[in-house]
Amino acid sequence: MSTETVKTPLASGRKAIFSPASSPVYAPGRRDFFKYRQLAASEGEMTAQVMTTNAGLTEPTGWHYHICESQFIYVLKGTLDLDLEDGSSVHMVAGDSLLLPGGMKHNETSTSTDFELLEVMLPKLEGTVPCDPPGSDQSK
């Protein structure tokens, strides 16, 4: 089988898209300490990727938000800690999931060394925007 994504036309004109795990496609990421493996579903309609880290998160990501309608995350392996705009903190383990509305500020603060996460954004991710922490006085 080819190492390229296989596209099969359907009667509707849409295509089934297959990306074999044996030939992963990695995209440049928003963070140097994460690896972003793009999944077939990323064909412009949504962003779907598996995020991993080689040594665990060594520093927080910093407060940011994503330009999308929804961000769904599902922890495949390891752990993830993050702070949310509403003041809550979440500790996630394998099997946990979280749905964030687009534009919600958050900050990943730590991961385990074996961290692996499925992330889906609808519609596709249009950008990541660094921002001040919630409640900070932006006039200073």
Residue ranges and their predicted role:
Residues 44-45, 87, 113:
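Short strand-connecting beta-turns/loops that link adjacent beta-strands
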Residues 28, 60-67, 84, 90, ...:
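Short histidine-centered beta-strand/loop micro-motifs
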Residues 25-63, 69:
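A short glycine-rich, His/Asp/Glu-containing loop-to-beta-strand
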Residues 70, 77, 87, 103-105:
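A generic structural motif
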Residues 86-103:
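Short acidic-glycine-tyrosine-enriched beta hairpin
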